[in-house]
Amino acid sequence: MSEQHSPIISVQDVSKKLGDHILLSKVSFSVYPGEVFGIVGHSGSGKTTLLRCLDFLDMPTSGSISVAGFDNSLPTQKFSRRNFSKKVAYISQNYGLFSSKTVFENIAYPLRIHHSEMSKSEVEEQVYDTLNFLNLYHRHDAYPGNLSGGQKQKVAIARAIVCQPEVVLCDEITSALDPKSTENIIERLLQLNQERGITLVLVSHEIDVVKKICSHVLVMHQGAVEELGTTEELFLNSENSITNELFHEDINIAALSSCYFAEDREEVLRLNFSKELAIQGIISKVIQTGLVSINILSGNINLFRKSPMGFLIIVLEGEVEQRKKAKELLIELGVVIKEFY
């Protein structure tokens, strides 16, 4: 983000305890307007607790939180949930829809609560505009019980954005969806971010979702910040074991470790590559030098915010000096090398 912007979310030294149990420990980070910010980590790492603190549903034991101009230093009696909800919306994995209300009525509800000054026609116009944006107009008179999981989540998103918030907090909103519905939700969230400038904070255990949508990622472990950076930086360059475990969970290290490799002449490498390198013949360029032989064990290409990035697991075979020269060539080509053995 541009340096001239102030953070729309600022978290400084936030800790939270429940009895003797530490839920969050000195968490600090900033989110800037227009970012799609991911929060990842294993179960129990503090992701949802942190998100609830950002929504002021939970309060930290210590530290400061500022979100869209509201902060936790305000006395409880002076904090206006109504005013806060005009600027910040929260979407959970459980949809939270009123079963007795139609799709239209569910989406109109926050407008009637937070914008009572709006006329009936103004409410209808804003609701139908939101329905059209999410391709839900044809279901406006349906009840939640008659909707698919993906449609319910779209309604939850519509209800969250109908008041035109500055920030939307998303808690595991694709966890119960099938792959096609997940892709659809990702596209809509990206569209929200790019066309309406809404800042998104996304908690997810689905790392593929994070790769596809997030510009920046906070990695949490046991309630603390393990690592923070752009999605590309963490995928390509991280040396952190927790980050690599999350970002490269599709690499079966145990299976690779069980393979036999001849001493001195073979080594296993992970090659990380980004953008234009994903479609170039980087392996063939190395093989053509005649320095080494290369066997490909595994590989994958993912879209990171519509830019291809991926990895290859290879066995590099040759004499020590030849392997060294081959690795130097790979680095010159822009490949990031991680050694297994």
Curated annotation (Swiss-Prot):
The protein, known as: Methionine import ATP-binding protein MetN
Q: Which cysteines are joined by disulfide bonds?
A: none
Is Chaperone included in the keywords of this UniProt record? Answer: no
Give me the reactions it catalyses. Answer: L-methionine(out) + ATP + H2O = L-methionine(in) + ADP + phosphate + H(+); D-methionine(out) + ATP + H2O = D-methionine(in) + ADP + phosphate + H(+)
Keyword Ribonucleoprotein included in the entry's annotation: no
* Protein source organism: Chlamydia pneumoniae
Query: What Pfam families does the record point to?
Result: ABC_tran, NIL
Biological role: Part of the ABC transporter complex MetNIQ involved in methionine import. Responsible for energy coupling to the transport system.
Task: Extract the InterPro entries matched here.
Answer: AAA+_ATPase, ABC_transporter-like_ATP-bd, ABC_transporter-like_CS, ACT-like_dom_sf, MetN_ABC, MetN_ABC_transporter-like, NIL_domain, P-loop_NTPase
- One Gene Ontology cellular component: plasma membrane
Q: Which residues take part in binding ATP?
A: 41-48
Membrane topology designation: Peripheral membrane protein
